[in-house]
Amino acid sequence: MKTNLSSQITLNRVSPRYYRPENAFERSVLTRLEKIPTDIYESAEEGANQIALDIAQLIRDKQKAGRFCVLALAGGNSPRNVYADLVRMHQEEGLSFRNVVIFNLYEYYPLAPNAINSNFNALKEMLIDHVDIDKQNVFTPDSTIAKDAIFEYCRLYEQRIESFGGLDIALLGIGRVGNIGFNEPGSRLNSTTRLILLDNDSRNEASKMFGSIENTPISSITMGVATILSAKKIYLLAWGEEKAQKVKECVEGPVTDTIPASYLQTHNNAHVAIDLSAAANLTRIQRPWLVTSCEWNDKLIRSAIVWLCQLTGKPILKLTNKDYNENGLSELLALFGSAYNVNIKIFNDLQHTITGWPGGKPNADDTYRPERAKPYPKRVVVFSPHPDDDVISMGGTLRRLVEQKHDVHVAYETSGNIAVGDEEVIRFLHFINGFNQIFNNSEDQVINDKYTEIRKYLKEKKDGDMDTRDILTIKGLIRRGEARTACTYNNIPLDHCHFLDLPFYETGKIQKNPISEADVEIVRNLLREVKPHQIFVAGDLADPHGTHRVCTDAVFAAIDLEKEEGAKWLKECRIWMYRGAWAEWEIENIEMAVPISPEELRAKRNSILKHQSQMESAPFLGNDERLFWQRSEDRNRGTAALYDSLGLASYEAMEAFVEYIPL
C-alpha cells in the first residue's frame, strides 16, 4: 500500500539539470545568485537521509578518535526524518551514540517540568529515547529556572558547550520569520545563549504545539547566533513550499538581521538542504531563464509569460519582441518566431482553463473545456480533511455542482475535534443541561453526571492537559452539526454527508499517527459505494506533516489500490485538487478556474460562517490574523484579479483546481 503518493506530485516537472548539475561549471552557473552552498533533493526523505549519513559518519569518525561528537539539535518537523534515519541506523546498523553529546537548541520559558509540549520532549520522542546515548551527555535549557538566575544560567550553558570542545554540528530549521532557533528578526550577529521574548509570528507558529496562542509561552531560552555560528559545520533544513520564500531570502538575499538565517552566509561550512518544494522560489528553479538556457515546456512558458506581464505591467496580448529580448526570454522568440505567436498560445491556454461548468457542460463541445460533457449528471465526491475545508476551499464550486444537478457527496475525513475551544463545549453542555431540565425535569442522570464531570475537568484543566475521550467526542459532535448545517444551506442531502472519522487523527494530540490500512479502507469503501465520476481532494501540499496532506495521501492510496484491481469506475473518473484554506495554486499550474459572481461569493461566505466554532477564538487559526472566510475571499478575488491583469475576462472571484492523474 502506497501511503505517500502526494510526495510524488510534481506540478512543474523541474528539469533535473537545474538542481543536479552534471559538473562544477554548471553548478557555478546555476548557483551564481546563491550565497550559501545549497543542495536540492527531490524529496524531504532523500535530503534527510543524506544529512543523517553525514552525521553518522562524523559520529563514527569521532568514536575511532576517542572523542565526543557534539551536536546542537532543533525540534520541530524539519529534522524529524533525519532523526528517524539515525534511529534506524542505530537499530539496524549498530550506530552507537555513546560518544554523542546533545545540546537542545532552544526551550520555551516558562514551562512546567517534563511538559509534553516542550521542545526537549519532542527531541526525546524523535531521537533520544530510542538510542544508547548517555543521558548525562544530554543538555537542555531549564525552563523552570528563576528569572533572576537566567543570565548566569545562560552563561554556564555556553561554558558547558565549550567544555566539550565546542559544537561539531548544528542542525537547524528555518522559521516563518527567517529565524534560526528563536533568534528572531533583530537578533545580533554576536548574540549568545539568552532569554528572548517571542513575537506574535513565533508564538503563532508555536501555538500548534500548545493548542492556542493563549497557552503558548511568551519567551524562550535559545542559543544565540554567535553560538550557532561557532559550530564547525551547520546544516539548515527546509521542506515544503511554505518555507520557499524564507529560503530564497536566506540563500539569495543580503545578510540582514531581519532574516537571521542569512547570517549563515558568513560561515565557511554552512549547508542548506531543501526539497524541490522549498526550492520553488530560488532563481534556478522559479526563473531558470535568468541564469541558464532552459528546457521549455508548456508550464514553464506560461510561468515566464505571467512573470513578464507582471514585470512590464502589460496584459499578455500587448507583450512585444522588445519585452522578451530585454528580460532574458529571447529563447522563446527563437522557438515561436515572434512575441505574437507566444502570446496567442498562452492566452488561449489560460482562456481554456475558465469554465462555469465544473462538472462539465451537457450537450456542449468539450474539446477545449477542462471537464467532460458526459456523463451527465455526474456522481461527485468532495473530500474535506476537516469539516469546513469543503466550503472554505471550494464553496462556490460545490454550490455550482449542486445547482447544475450533479449528485454531490461530501466526505469529512477527520472529526476536527481538537480544533474546538473548551468554551464551545461548555456552551453546548449548558444547552444539553438546560434541555434536560426543561423537557425531562432533570431526570436523565447520565446528562446530570456528565455535565458535572466535564465542567469540573475543564475548570481544573491545566496547560498541556489532554482532553478526555468524552470531551473530544463532544467537540467532534459540534463540528458534525456545523458541517450538516452548511450542507443543508448548500442543498446537499444529509444522507450525502459522510463522516469518516479516520483513525489516524484520533490521538487527542496535535501530533497524529501515520495513516494505516484502516484509514485507507474507510476511504476505499466510500469510493466503491459511490463510484464517482469526479473526485475533489485537498491539494495543500505545503506541510508534509499536516492533516490535509495525510488525508490526501489516504485518498490517493485508496485510488491506487482500486487502480491495481482494475476498478471500472476509476476509468471514467477525474480527480481535481483544490486549495484555498492556506494558499492558492500558482497560475501556471491552474487547469480549471471556476468564476464566482458577487452573489455566489456571499453564499460561500455564509456557508463558511455556519462553522461557528472556527471563528475568532478557534485554535489553530495559524499566523494569518484574518478569519477563514476573509482569507478565502481575498484569495479568490486575487485569482480573478490576476486573470484580469493578464487580459482575460474580469470576474468577482475564482476558485482554481489542478488535475491529479493517478501514478
What name fits each language-model region?
Residues 2-12, 223-226, 232-330:
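ATP/nucleoside-binding phosphotransfer catalytic cores, i.e., glycine-rich phosphate-binding loops
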Residues 19-35, 95-169:
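Ligand-binding beta-strand-loop-alpha-helix segment within the catalytic cores
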Residues 82-93, 390-415, 419:
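Histidine-anchored nucleotide/phosphate-binding helix
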Residues 2-70, 366-367, 374:
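N-terminal glycine-/serine-/threonine-rich phosphate-binding loop
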Residues 181-225:
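Class I SAM-dependent methyltransferase SAM-binding "motif I" and its flanking Rossmann-like core
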Residues 176-198, 251-254, 549-558, 591-596:
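Short, surface-exposed, charged loop/turn segments at secondary-structure junctions
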Residues 203-211, 215-220, 312-381, 400-404, ...:
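Metal-dependent de-N-acetylase/amidase catalytic core
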Residues 64-92:
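Glycine-rich N-terminal segment of FAD-binding domains in flavoprotein oxidoreductases
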